[in-house]
């Protein structure tokens, strides 16, 4: 065999191989490469979107946290105000109840004082009758001297 013939036959075989590859294999390879490039581009775009969404979610969570802290602060302030109002109301109720108790106690003291005075008047009248009976050495009839005792009681009042 001649080297020229071998070289030419190899060149023809190589040309046929290139032609076959370019016509039948190359489009599938290009399509696979393009699909892979598209998947990579989609993945990168999804990564960027995810990064932006993460940033937005971080901002939203920061805002929600800030709002929650503000709301919690408002709730604490309202609770403190309500507690203060309850304490003031309890103090006012205690004052009113204390005044009622004092007024009741004063009325009871006044009633007891009046009862004690009446009892003392009756005892004084009895002692006066006994004293008069001892002085006169005879017993004084209470029915006869009822007017006298009533006038003594009136003077003691």
Curated annotation (Swiss-Prot):
Protein name: ATP synthase subunit b
UniProt superkingdom: Bacteria
Keywords: ATP synthesis, Cell inner membrane, Cell membrane, CF(0), Hydrogen ion transport, Ion transport, Membrane, Transmembrane, Transmembrane helix, Transport
Matches recorded under SUPFAM superfamilies: F1F0 ATP synthase subunit B, membrane domain
Location of this chain's protein in the cell: Cell inner membrane
Coiled-coil boundaries: none
HAMAP family per the UniProt record, alphabetical: ATP_synth_b_bprime
Role noted for this protein: F(1)F(0) ATP synthase produces ATP from ADP in the presence of a proton or sodium gradient. F-type ATPases consist of two structural domains, F(1) containing the extramembraneous catalytic core and F(0) containing the membrane proton channel, linked together by a central stalk and a peripheral stalk. During catalysis, ATP synthesis in the catalytic domain of F(1) is coupled via a rotary mechanism of the central stalk subunits to proton translocation. Component of the F(0) channel, it forms part of the peripheral stalk, linking F(1) to F(0).
One annotated Gene Ontology cellular component of this protein: plasma membrane
Organism: Nitrosomonas europaea (strain ATCC 19718 / CIP 103999 / KCTC 2705 / NBRC 14298)
Membership in a protein family: Belongs to the ATPase B chain family.
Pfam families the UniProt entry points to: ATP-synt_B
Entries under InterPro entries matching the protein: ATP_synth_B-like_membr_sf, ATP_synth_b/b'su_bac/chlpt, ATP_synth_F0_bsu_bac, ATP_synthase_B_chain
């Amino acid at each position: 065999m001649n080297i020229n013939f071998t070289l030419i036959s190899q060149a023809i075989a190589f040309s046929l191989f290139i032609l076959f590859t370019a016509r039948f294999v190359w489009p599938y390879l290009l399509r696979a490469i393009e699909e892979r490039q598209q998947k990579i581009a989609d993945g990168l775009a999804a990564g960027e979107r995810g990064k932006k969404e993460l940033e937005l979610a971080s901002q939203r969570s920061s805002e929600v946290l800030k709002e929650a802290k503000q709301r919690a602060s408002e709730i604490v302030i309202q609770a403190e105000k309500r507690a203060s109002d309850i304490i003031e109301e309890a103090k006012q109720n205690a004052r009113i109840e204390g005044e009622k108790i004092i007024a009741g106690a004063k009325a009871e003291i006044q009633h007891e004082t009046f009862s004690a005075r009446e009892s003392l008047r009756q005892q004084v009248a009895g002692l006066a009758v006994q004293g008069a009976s001892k002085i006169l050495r005879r017993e004084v009839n209470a029915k006869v001297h009822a007017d006298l005792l009533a006038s003594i009681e009136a003077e003691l009042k």
